[in-house]
Amino acid sequence: MGTIYLFRKTQRSLLGKLTQEFRLVTADRRSWKILLFGAINVVCTGFLLTWCSSTNSMALTAYTYLTIFDLFSLITCLISYWVMMKKPSPTYSFGFERFEVLSVFASTVLAQLGALFILKESAERFVEQPEIHTGRLLVGTFVALCFNLFSMLSIRNKPFAYVSEAASTSWLQEHVADLSRSLCGIIPGLSSIFLPRMNPFVLIDIAGALALCITYMLIEINNYFAVDTASAIAIAVMTFGTMYPMSVYSGKVLLQTTPPHVIGQLDKLLREVSTLDGVLEVRNEHFWTLGFGTMAGSVHVRIRRDANEQMVLAHVTNRLNTLVSSLTVQIFKDEWARPVLASGAMPPNMLNIPDHHVIQMPSLKSTMDELNPMTSTPSKPSSPPPEFAFNTPGKNMNPVILSNNQTRPSGVGFNYGTTPYTTTFNHGLGVPGIGNTQGLRTGLTNVANRYGTYTPGQFTQFKQ
């Protein structure tokens, strides 16, 4: 018999979670309008795809893909309402704003993939151009144009509105802007409509409808069926050129990059923060775009020991909150200090060297693993080198090698005994089979010379 859990938490399926979130969105009356336009879009797309099949027009198919993109934009707008209703959770501490960024990126990338598919199909049609039926070509064009413009202008799509303004201009917008300047020079009243730049979605809808109208006229007059393929290529190229800057911008937001137009302002604010009273250093600063129009960041601030943490935190937050809405500031007090230098009298057993000493050398493998041959200091592979201090053994000291069969020199007042510094001898020099001498690395290289007892035959040196 299995274990019975009285208060076990039920796990909801993915479909159940989606249904719960959909009910949360539909609770807001503003989403009803989006759902209505979405239903109409599905019906219009179904009719347009049927007419594309009956007319055998590739240009109308490319224009229908713009209607499908409008459906994606409505879904993005619905996600934007859902993001405003949701509160941050432990898993998503910064909120759910990146979901609408991901939705914009996915919509623009799918539109570009559809444009590439149209280009591939159009290239195949150049080899053998089929006959185009113009019975419902013009009807489908006006139905798609009216619905696209009506949905774009009736619903305020916040994510796409922000991206279309923040992203770089497409080549279609630049060419239309040049023509608009020339036209506004003749008719100044049109400057409010065409300048500074038109909405890219409205522009591509109008340009695609004009291409289809030209296609209809040429096929009706001259039976020139190749113009349908040319119009399909033109609509696909315009679609790709319009969506590419938006996908690049939303992709940079997903990669947590800092917007280029904000870098100068952030540098100025960080310089101001570094000059605040009590602030010693500003480091590990990282700022990125969390969502459309929302920035997040984190910074580490090192302050003096006597500085007021709350006061510094308030000033830093006040300076950076003008640009960064979600800010994390970590305050560190200056607790760094140099290691205490050894000072005082020399221990008396420092110079105790036995007459006939036998020093038990440590294992060669363990010693070489534990000691660094350059500093004689225990080191770890991942740890930084030890801090330099005076009167300590180091690589700048000249080592001393003591002979094993040395004689007592006259005039030296050494007390012979066992030396306690068994771990400071050079490893490998006293091991049988390697050599018969043992090296003592010490910071007292010049001690013997200091007491006037150094003789060239007594000590020898080796180079590192």
From Swiss-Prot:
Residues 1-33, 86-98, 156-200, 250-464 are cytoplasmic. Keywords: Golgi apparatus, Ion transport, Membrane, Transmembrane, Transmembrane helix, Transport, Zinc, Zinc transport. The chain crosses the membrane at residues 34-54, 65-85, 99-119, 135-155, 201-221, 229-249. GO terms for biological process: zinc ion import into Golgi lumen. Residues 55-64, 120-134, 222-228 are extracellular. It is found in: Golgi apparatus, trans-Golgi network membrane. Pfam families: Cation_efflux. The keyword Transport applies. One of its GO terms (molecular function) is monoatomic cation transmembrane transporter activity. InterPro entries: Cation_efflux (IPR002524), Cation_efflux_TMD_sf (IPR027469), CDF_SLC30A (IPR052005). SUPFAM superfamilies: Cation efflux protein transmembrane domain-like (SSF161111). It is a multi-pass membrane protein. GO terms for cellular component: trans-Golgi network membrane. Heterodimer with SLC30A5; form a functional zinc ion transmembrane transporter. Has probably no intrinsic transporter activity but together with SLC30A5 forms a functional zinc ion:proton antiporter heterodimer, mediating zinc entry into the lumen of organelles along the secretory pathway. As part of that zinc ion:proton antiporter, contributes to zinc ion homeostasis within the early secretory pathway and regulates the activation and folding of enzymes like alkaline phosphatases and enzymes involved in phosphatidylinositol glycan anchor biosynthesis. Belongs to the cation diffusion facilitator (CDF) transporter (TC 2.A.4) family. SLC30A subfamily. This is Zinc transporter 6. The gene is slc30a6.
